[in-house]
Structures are given as C-alpha cells and as structure tokens.
C-alpha cells in the first residue's frame, strides 16, 4: 500500500469540502482525473428508455440514467434528476452515514431566491450543515464521526462538487487554531489522520503535481480505527478495501484487499 497517496474517506472529505465555506482561504483545488477517449469508449450505452441522462457521480466518466423522484440515492449512486437532490430521510439520526450507504431519497430541491448565486447558496448551506470554526475551537476532542453526524446537506444535482475541493484548507485553518495539535490527539487513528493531512498539505504545495489517490484513516468516535478501511480515487476506478485491527490500524494478516466489501467481521470471529 502506498504511504499516503492511496485513499480518501468519502464522508470526511465531503464534509471538508463544505467546511471550507466557513473556513479560511483555499489553495488550488484537486480535480478528478480527465476522462480519456479510451475510458469513454468502455462506457456501456445508456438505455434508450432513459428519460434523462446525467453526468456520472463522483469521478466516473460514464453517463448514467438520472434517478427519478423518490428513488433511493446516495454518495456513490447515480445523480438525481434535474430539480431533485439527494437528501437523508426526515428523522434520520445519522444523515451522512445513511447517504454514504445509498439510503437517501431524491426529493425536490428547496426553493431559492432568484437573486441567490451558486456561491452564496453553497455558503449558506455550508454554514447550516457543519459545526462552526468557533465551536470546533472549543471542542478539541471533536471527532470525525461527530462532525459527520452534524452534516446533512448534499449538493443539488445541477451542481458539480469536486470530492476534494479545498480539503487541505480546512486542515490549515484547524492548525492555525491549534485544533490539530498532535499532542492533543492521543488516540492512534486521530493522530495518524492529522499526520496524513499534514503530508497532503505539503504535497499540494508542489506546483504541477496531479494527485488522484489519497489515504485518510477512517476513525471511529473514540479515535481508533474502523476495521474496514477503503480507498477512493479521483480517476473513476473503484477503490480497494481492506481490514485492520481497530486498536492499531495494522492490516489483519491473511485478510484480502478487494474492490468490494472485505467482510472484516469474519476475521474478528476467527481472531477473538
């Protein structure tokens, strides 16, 4: 496994992409890998019966059939049809957790004033969706899971939100506020998370570098590792997943790397 240019945690980076609306200034954003003629040539045809063809979600290249009103949707599914956006169901206690598992629904986009610009609407949604910088500074033990649970808005289908848009800016802002002081983060996954972000911040300063794969540790609310760790790439290829020990983050011997679900529970049934 490459040292850090391997994986990105979908929920955490989606959160970071919106946090920047309330954080400090941003460096140059990273973009998805370009769709080459070769990759486009491998795309399956969209059914002729499809009423609306939409752009692929994430960093994919193949057009898809837009999801209709009421259809199940999520971070990695096809986009909702025009005029709809993917939202967690009312009363859902963990909205983003549900969206990352395709348990949202395509619903009408909320009406916006005619004078509202794309930037201002994103900014207002960001402020409403995430914990403010002041709240973060007063809660140095705030975890990834707590942050994710505070996030409940997804970009409307007409908007194209880069996965890693200004993610490092949020880290830089947190560093400035001493939120990410490694001495304050005692648990292993939390410490590795911010070390990786620091390396990514340094890598982004190198002009001309095009980085399409990243790794961010997937931490639980206690600062340890989720047993399932996955990669997400910006080149449209499905990422690998693997299993680790929650207390150390080290890969479980004999466990496989797969582009699907590695079923990590099976290894704990054996080892416990």
UniProtKB/Swiss-Prot annotation:
GO terms for biological process: insulin receptor signaling pathway; positive regulation of cell growth; response to insulin; tissue regeneration. Keywords: Disulfide bond, Growth factor binding, Phosphoprotein, Secreted, Signal. The keyword Cytoplasm does not apply. The keyword Membrane does not apply. The modification Phosphoserine is found at residues 139, 157, 169, 255. GO terms for cellular component: extracellular space; Golgi apparatus. It is found in: Secreted. Disulfide bonds join 32-59, 35-61, 43-62, 50-65, 73-86, 80-106, 189-219, 230-241, 243-264. Residues 1-25 form the signal peptide. The modification Phosphotyrosine is found at residue 171. Residues 28-109 form the IGFBP N-terminal domain. Pfam families: IGFBP, Thyroglobulin_1. Residues 186-264 form the Thyroglobulin type-1 domain. A motif (Cell attachment site) lies at residues 259-261. One of its GO terms (molecular function) is insulin-like growth factor I binding. Multifunctional protein that plays a critical role in regulating the availability of IGFs such as IGF1 and IGF2 to their receptors and thereby regulates IGF-mediated cellular processes including cell migration, proliferation, differentiation or apoptosis in a cell-type specific manner. Also plays a positive role in cell migration by interacting with integrin ITGA5:ITGB1 through its RGD motif. Mechanistically, binding to integrins leads to activation of focal adhesion kinase/PTK2 and stimulation of the mitogen-activated protein kinase (MAPK) pathway. Binds equally well IGF1 and IGF2. Interacts with integrin ITGA5:ITGB1. Interacts with VHL; this interaction inhibits HIF1A degradation. This is Insulin-like growth factor-binding protein 1. It comes from Mus musculus. The lineage of its organism: Eukaryota, Metazoa, Chordata, Craniata, Vertebrata. The gene is Igfbp1.
